C-alpha cells in the first residue's frame, strides 16, 4: 500500500491527504482555512505569532497549557509577553478581570493584542467553556480591537458536553487549535 500511496509536497498543496484534512478541519470549525502542524503546542504558537506583533502581550489563564507547558515559546520565538490572569475552577477567567487587564497604548506596558482561552481546560478538571462565555469574551475582544484564540486541544470534548457543533461554538473566535490525538 505504501508504494501506491499518493505523495506530494504539502508546501505546494500537492499532498492530497493534507489538503483533504485541512479542508475538513476548516469546514468543521467554520473557519476560512486550516493548517496542519505537528503538535498542539505548535498550533498555539503559530496562532499567537499571527495575532501578536513582537512586543505586545496576550492575556491567558495562569493554569493555561500555553503558559504552563509550552516552554515559553510565545516569548522565546515571538517576543510576546504573557499576562496571566487567575483561572477559576471551571477554567473561566472572570469577565471583569479580562476587561481590567487590557492595556492600550501606554509607553510603560506592552499593548494587549490577544486573549487566549482553553476549552476544555486541562488543569481545571476538563470543564467546557460555554458558548455564552466564549461570546462574552469575543465581545470584549472585538470592542477592544483584540483577537481571541481558543486552545482547543480537547474542544471536541466540549462540543459533546455542550451538545453543540464546533463551528457554532467557535463562530466568534479568530483562531482555534485542536488535537487529532485527543477526544476523537
Roles of regions detected by a PLM:
Residues 1-5, 11-184:
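Conserved PLP-enzyme active-site core in the AAT-like
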